[in-house]
């Protein structure tokens, strides 16, 4: 199978799984369920279910590769990296899900599309890498667009709650930046045995399961009990939860496949465009009202992201022509 055909299959897989995933996520976390008269806001329980499903699917993915490098051996050799990456990932998801209680879903998706911001912060604060003027300009555009959209909503909640939700989104974005940078470094690290995307998928999701189990058992047993009680009272939640977990797990297979076999630029482009479609789909399906100032925010963010993507493509083409 040719490289282009594989890429098309991967892109279609990412779109199909994560578009369905996003449609299941919104009612799962924001609907007030009839029997319990409450939202299913148990973020750590949701992440636990998602990670457990992804670990099982990832193990099947790794077995299908027949690489001869098992998940246990990989985890033993790289347990420190796996623990660190999974911790930032485990903390990011509950923060993002929790923010949905205070900001609307389209604002959430818009913020999660801004991958440039956490990457810039990680490079400046963690790796002490200078940021060029182009990237700084895009960062300003993205920040301004997010602020316009999030603070310009038609139906505003209390000011403190909205600012709190925005703060939780920013924390989640920064943790995403740490996660992505560390994943990329581990995947491309020289090793005696080849590390694949399937190895990362199994190891990271297994660790996330352990992190969340420890949290629920040691610090928040009421969340575990509340989750089970609400699922018993409103069994319809299970349909959305299963769809959310299954689509997320299958989507991770395509994501790690793309990251392993193609450049991070390709994956970023696919991810950003998928999130754009998710936002527009959410507006159409769930009838969100969007003010003109919010549309301006969307245009500013997407304009900055697309401009940065074009600039990266031009730089890549220039480097290739120099090599020839």
From Swiss-Prot:
Keywords assigned by UniProt, alphabetized: Endoplasmic reticulum, Glycoprotein, Membrane, Sugar transport, Transmembrane, Transmembrane helix, Transport
Pfam families: UAA
A Gene Ontology cellular-component term: endoplasmic reticulum membrane
Entry membrane topology: Multi-pass membrane protein
Residue stretches in coiled coil: none
Sugar-modified residues: 97
Protein name per UniProt: UDP-galactose transporter homolog 1
Gene: HUT1
